[in-house]
Amino acid sequence: MTEPTFPRRPQAIFLMGPTASGKTVLAMALHQHLPVEIISVDSALIYRGMDIGTAKPGADELARAPHRLIDIRDPAEAYSAADFRRDALKEMAEITEAGRIPLLVGGTMLYFKALLEGLSPLPSADPEVRARIEREAETVGWQALHRQLQQIDPIAANRIHPNDPQRLLRALEVFFVSGNTLTELTKISGEALAYRVHQFAIVPLDRALLHQRIAQRFHQMLAAGFEHEVSTLFARGDLHREMPSIRCVGYRQMWSYLADETDYDDMVFRGICATRQLAKRQMTWLRGWHDVHWLDSDEPAALDRVLQVVSA
């Protein structure tokens, strides 16, 4: 009796790493050596008009290797992990059907997790419900809404700080829209990714070197016109500091400076510190990641290592 044969799952490559670790440089090199198409996995690169502070690939880089899922939202618009998973799966299918390999590059680890493991069946954002919650917050304050969440979903309330309006808003919204708590819904597992995924994490082994690069990059952004970029957003009038776009590292600190809440030197210091904290959180995610190949961003053989694994 002939054994049944099953179609081999298509390949995909994850290239993960903290900010300023050299992901883009390696991705560009891989684009030259492999039949790959790059998909950005970055919650900041999705926004139009936010180029300098996000270290978005330049026009020359994009001409040589186009990146999908960048510049797809206005800074006033929301974009969730569920939105990313939907869009990424669509892009991956198109790339695979063209006989090429999706190369997913970035540092938004929640997006990678959502794509790899699937998502719990959480409801989509509801503008009317959100507006109602925000109006209530203006009246009674977020502390009172946190106490309300403590009654509805104590487990989520214990995880969410009273001064984190974005997560607090989402937890309440989920309950009011679905009738189920965030804790209940997140226990339901999602659909795993139907690809053979080669996972790589690129990091500088010397933490001091990473910190040096972060500071250097921040100063380069300032020299490139970061203040003007944020002042353009600031002047629009429809954006505020609690929006996900303005909460991006660097933008929030520059926003405070433009609002005359801090001086220039303090803004620079806080921006660099916030970027270092982001890198630390990204590294914490990566240390708990399974089946990942570690790459030293300062090792010239990193490219060869990826090529060897993917070609095996």
Curated annotation (Swiss-Prot):
Binding site for ATP: 17-24
Cofactor(s) needed: Mg(2+)
Example GO molecular function: ATP binding
Provenance organism: Sodalis glossinidius (strain morsitans)
Class of this enzyme: transferase
Chain positions of site Interaction with substrate tRNA: 108, 130
Reaction catalyzed: adenosine(37) in tRNA + dimethylallyl diphosphate = N(6)-dimethylallyladenosine(37) in tRNA + diphosphate
Name of the featured protein: tRNA dimethylallyltransferase
Quaternary structure note: Monomer.
GO annotation (BP), single: tRNA modification
Sorted UniProt keywords: ATP-binding, Magnesium, Nucleotide-binding, Transferase, tRNA processing
Any Pfam family matching the protein: IPPT
Residues the entry annotates as binding substrate: 19-24
The organism's place on the tree of life at top rank: Bacteria
Ranges for region Interaction with substrate tRNA: 42-45, 166-170, 247-252
InterPro entries linked to this entry: Dimethylallyltransferase, IPT, P-loop_NTPase
Family that this chain belongs to: Belongs to the IPP transferase family.
Function recorded in the entry: Catalyzes the transfer of a dimethylallyl group onto the adenine at position 37 in tRNAs that read codons beginning with uridine, leading to the formation of N6-(dimethylallyl)adenosine (i(6)A).
EC number annotated for this UniProt entry: 2.5.1.75
